[in-house]
Amino acid sequence: MSALETQALGMIPMVIEQSGRGERSYDIYSRLLKERVIFLVGEVNDQTANLVVAQLLFLESENPDKDISFYINSPGGSVTAGMAIYDTMQFIKPDVSTLCCGFAASMGAFLLAAGAKGKRYSLPNSKIMIHQVLGGARGQATDIEIHARDILRTKEQMNRILAERTGQPIEKVKADTERDYFMTADEAKDYGIVDQVIAKRP
């Protein structure tokens, strides 16, 4: 890949607005934030979680009674980072409407299901995947044992929340998350991860 192509991949479109006082340029994500739209694109990690949490809190302070739209296209990532987003979504006053555009896997699917009931959507050709928590403990046997216990506790916690959010029996969620469980948008609706599959805006 050429240097030019690499640079182009990192480019963020700018939007220019004109007013009586002149012109002002925004990056596209800042402009959409003005419309109460937040994007989660790519891996869930501490950096992306901090950005999403900050945007959620900012939009709540702007208007605690107006919904926030949360667009997700993510393969998942860190459980602790994802739980920071999840807890903030439940903590703030505005309803958070979620929409999968592309792929929502692992923590991405978990956050998709975390939206306000009745306001969780998927575009028709999106894919959703759930699975169990991944661990990568190394070190002394005692340390590995401590991490293993924590992973099992986290797995139980996430399965319980997913069961509550989807309406599925906990035993079914446990069985389905043992391995990668892929769903189409319609299958995710049947499962209870989303409430509606939409092809066009209402």
UniProtKB/Swiss-Prot annotation:
Segments forming a coiled coil: none
Q: Where is it chiefly localized?
A: cytoplasm
This protein's superkingdom?
Bacteria
Task: Please tell me whether the keyword Protease is annotated for this protein.
Answer: yes
Q: Does the keyword Protease apply?
A: yes
Give the enzyme's EC designation: 3.4.21.92
A molecular-function term among this protein's GO annotations = ATP-dependent peptidase activity
What does the UniProt record say this protein does? Cleaves peptides in various proteins in a process that requires ATP hydrolysis. Has a chymotrypsin-like activity. Plays a major role in the degradation of misfolded proteins.
Subunit and interaction comment? Fourteen ClpP subunits assemble into 2 heptameric rings which stack back to back to give a disk-like structure with a central cavity, resembling the structure of eukaryotic proteasomes.
Question: What is the name listed in the Swiss-Prot or TrEMBL entry for this protein?
Answer: ATP-dependent Clp protease proteolytic subunit
> What species is given as this protein's source?
Acidovorax sp. (strain JS42)
Q: Identify the taxonomic lineage of the organism of origin.
A: Bacteria, Pseudomonadati, Pseudomonadota, Betaproteobacteria, Burkholderiales
